[in-house]
């Protein structure tokens, strides 16, 4: 292998190429690689922030859901208590009204019983007077008296 001037010229051209590449080609490539690395790092940091924010938001949502469930349960319990109170009040009113109706019916039945007794007394008195008149008009006879008493029984 012979070393001649072309080898030195090729070495110089190679050095010029390396210097040119280091001066003009390598900085934009290095800059692009650095920018890409920075974007990747920023993306990872943003993903971490988003993940932590997501965890915080999920916790807040769970807290709000638990609060809402508790409020809903308490409102439902209040509504059930109110409904039960209204039902009890309606039952009490209905019982009271029923008692009034029963008392009125008993009073009316008692009044009708008294009126019926009065009517019966008047009829019995009239029949007794009528029977006494008939007995006094006729002669005193045990058979006739028994017959009259039997007729009076059937009329009563």
Swiss-Prot record:
It holds the Pfam family ATP-synt_B. InterPro entries: ATP_synth_B-like_membr_sf, ATP_synth_b/b'su_bac/chlpt, ATP_synth_F0_bsu_bac, ATP_synthase_B_chain. CDD domains: ATP-synt_Fo_b. It is found in: Cell inner membrane. Belongs to the ATPase B chain family. This is ATP synthase subunit b. Keywords: ATP synthesis, Cell inner membrane, Cell membrane, CF(0), Hydrogen ion transport, Ion transport, Membrane, Transmembrane, Transmembrane helix, Transport. Gene3D superfamilies: 6.10.250.1580.
């Amino acid at each position: 292998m012979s070393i001649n001037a072309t080898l030195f010229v090729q070495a110089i051209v190679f050095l010029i190429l390396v210097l040119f590449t280091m001066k003009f080609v390598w900085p934009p490539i290095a800059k692009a690689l650095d920018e890409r690395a920075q974007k990747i790092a920023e993306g990872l940091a943003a993903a971490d922030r988003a993940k932590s924010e997501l965890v915080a938001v999920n916790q807040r949502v769970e807290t709000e859901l638990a609060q809402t469930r508790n409020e809903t349960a308490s409102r439902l319990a209040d509504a059930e208590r109110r409904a039960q109170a209204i039902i009890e009040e309606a039952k009490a009113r209905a019982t009271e009204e029923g008692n009034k109706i029963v008392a009125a019916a008993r009073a009316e039945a008692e009044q009708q019983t008294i009126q019926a007794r009065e009517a019966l007394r008047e009829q019995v008195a009239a029949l007794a007077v009528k029977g006494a008149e008939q007995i006094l008009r006729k002669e005193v006879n045990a058979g006739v008296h028994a017959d009259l008493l039997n007729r009076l029984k059937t009329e009563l």
